[in-house]
UniProtKB/Swiss-Prot annotation:
It comes from Salmonella typhimurium (strain LT2 / SGSC1412 / ATCC 700720). The active site is at D14, H42. IMP binds at D14, E15, G16, K17, N39, A40, G41, H42, T130, R144, Q225, T240, R304. InterPro entries: Adenylosuccin_syn_GTP-bd, Adenylosuccin_syn_Lys_AS, Adenylosuccinate_synth_dom1, Adenylosuccinate_synth_dom2, Adenylosuccinate_synth_dom3, Adenylosuccinate_synthetase, P-loop_NTPase. Its cofactor is Mg(2+). It catalyses: IMP + L-aspartate + GTP = N(6)-(1,2-dicarboxyethyl)-AMP + GDP + phosphate + 2 H(+). Binds 1 Mg(2+) ion per subunit. It is found in: Cytoplasm. Substrate binds at A300, T301, T302, G303, R304, R305, R306. CDD domains: AdSS. This is Adenylosuccinate synthetase.
Length: 432
């Protein structure tokens, strides 16, 4: 029996985590976000109604679930208020279902200004951030000058700390980036206007999770972005600013690391990436266009067209190692319907001619890397909405089996459409 289940992306994000978290929370009492910020974009489709969440955990739509934003998440008060209002306008009582860690760093207007000023200054070498202030907020946290949710309990001290940190950042904005200064009074007024709402949701998350563990409650930890965007283990510097791997669960929520029972890796049946950075299996031909169109590969947060390519099992094996994956959930299998053949990257050819089956680390080391493919027959039959494994074409079953063989991890869940009902649960993580 797995009480603490982690759901995370095994690629570069956009694997379809939100739907799976929402589906599995039928049995959960708590859903916890432990890293990232409102740069995430989790799309849920329930009874045909689409909901996109960026900051609030995907369990918020269920009345039996308490959603928690852990200390590893950088929290934008304005983004949270906007998201809360959208949900409350639809009759969802967010304030009754959402709790926050007081250790969450705040994202304020000057973080956004810095993020955008830096990307502009980088020009052609831009990282491709979402421009939401995520990186600068994490920088402030590590530099120990960041303001946190808990600082809002003492409004007078908060105002003093804010003045100090804004003088520092405005100096950089004006003198180095030649950008406009951010108005201190506006930031203070905007934050004070929502301070009481934020502090009313504060709880000791680590203690709450430990009590839940002792009671035997089911807890779901919801990852954002994907393994290959991890600040330490991803394609640095083309990465996000947090630990997207399973190790981030303990540090970003306060759960003891030995208490993680099952790690579910969400695996898209092909590969996508947003923004700059290495992508060995990227396709620039009509197949790449087909995957983009069929998969509706446009970012939920930015609306940017995603880069598309074949599934890279070399990179996925790295995700298996980093996360000690228990099982996969394979998503978007239906996007491959109609292709005459499908390919799996099984190794890389390095610039010096060597064949390797492990990924390079730094982005520069990926230069000149060529994918080595295994080609399999495709299938013409539709897999969309199929709810039983026996209803899948043999060629699709062969593709699934080969992924399991190449990665050494079982596919426990298969998703065949965006709705939560269009799913085959072969092994429930909470029963594993």
């Amino acid at each position: 029996m797995g009480n603490n289940v982690v759901v995370l992306g095994t690629q570069w994000g956009d694997e379809g985590k939100g739907k799976i978290v929402d589906l599995l929370t039928e049995r959960a009492k708590y859903v916890v976000r432990y890293q990232g910020g409102h740069n995430a974009g989790h799309t849920l489709v329930i009874n045909g109604e689409k909901t996109v969440l960026h900051l609030i955990p995907s369990g918020i739509l269920r009345e039996n679930v308490t959603s928690i934003i852990g200390n590893g998440v950088v929290l934008s008060p304005s983004a949270l208020m906007k998201e809360m209002k959208e949900l409350e306008d639809r009759g969802i009582p967010v304030r009754e279902r959402l709790l926050l860690s007081e250790a969450c760093p705040l994202i304020l207007d000057y973080h956004v200004a810095l993020d955008n000023a830096r990307e502009k200054a980088r020009g052609a070498k831009a990282i491709g951030t979402t421009g939401r202030g995520i990186g600068p907020a994490y920088e402030d946290k590590v530099a120990r000058r960041g303001l946190r949710v808990g600082d809002l309990f003492d409004k007078e001290t908060f105002a003093e700390k804010l003045k100090e940190v804004m003088e520092y950042h405005n100096f950089q904005l004006v003198n180095y980036y030649k950008a406009e200064a951010v108005d201190y009074q506006k930031v203070l007024d905007d934050t004070m206007a929502v301070a009481d709402i934020l502090t009313s949701m504060v709880v000791d998350v680590s203690d709450l999770l430990d009590q839940a563990r002792q009671r035997g409650d089911f807890v779901m930890f919801e990852g954002a972005q994907g393994t290959l965007l991890d600040i330490d283990h991803g394609t640095y510097p083309y990465v996000t600013s947090s630990n997207t791997t399973a190790g981030g669960v303990a540090t970003g929520s306060g759960l003891g690391p030995r208490y993680v029972d099952y790690v579910l890796g969400i695996l898209k049946a092909y590969s996508t990436r947003v923004g700059a950075g290495p992508f060995p299996t990227e396709l620039f031909d009509e197949t790449g266009e087909f995957l983009c169109k069929q998969g509706n590969e446009y970012g939920a947060t930015t609306g940017r067209r995603r880069r598309t390519g074949w599934l890279d099992t070399v990179a996925v094996r790295r995700a298996v190692q980093l996360n000690s994956l228990s099982g996969f959930c394979l998503t978007k299998l239906d996007v491959l319907d109609g292709l005459k053949e499908v390919k799996l990257c099984v190794a890389y050819r390095m610039p010096d001619g060597r064949e390797v089956t492990t990924t390079p680390l730094a982005a520069d080391d990926w230069k000149g890397v060529e994918p080595i493919y295994e080609t399999m027959p495709g299938w013409s039959e539709s897999t969309f909405g199929v709810k039983d494994r026996s209803g899948l074409p043999q060629a699709a079953l062969n593709y699934i089996k080969r992924i399991e063989e190449l990665t050494g991890v079982p596919i426990d869940i298969i998703s065949t459409g965006p709705d939560r009902t269009e799913t085959m649960i072969l092994r429930d993580p909470f029963d594993a």
